[in-house]
């Protein structure tokens, strides 16, 4: 996923269907310099992690 799209999703009030390793996730924050995102699985905020943006997949 590109940086701008990830930022748009993280700042939007609408939920986008994005997955990490096949698991639906919520994007909390995007780090443009490192090209990473802080994410957690939907419904499991205790499993927060930082991942590469390139590992995120948006589904339409």
Curated annotation (Swiss-Prot):
It holds the Pfam family SspH. GO terms for cellular component: endospore-forming forespore. GO terms for biological process: asexual sporulation; sporulation resulting in formation of a cellular spore. The keyword Lipoprotein does not apply. Induction: Expressed only in the forespore compartment of sporulating cells. It is found in: Spore core. Its main location: other. InterPro entries: SASP_SspH (IPR012610). The keyword Metal-binding does not apply. Keywords: Sporulation. NCBIfam families: SASP_H. Belongs to the SspH family. This is Small, acid-soluble spore protein H. It comes from Bacillus velezensis (strain DSM 23117 / BGSC 10A6 / LMG 26770 / FZB42) (Bacillus amyloliquefaciens subsp. plantarum). The lineage of its organism: Bacteria, Bacillati, Bacillota, Bacilli, Bacillales.
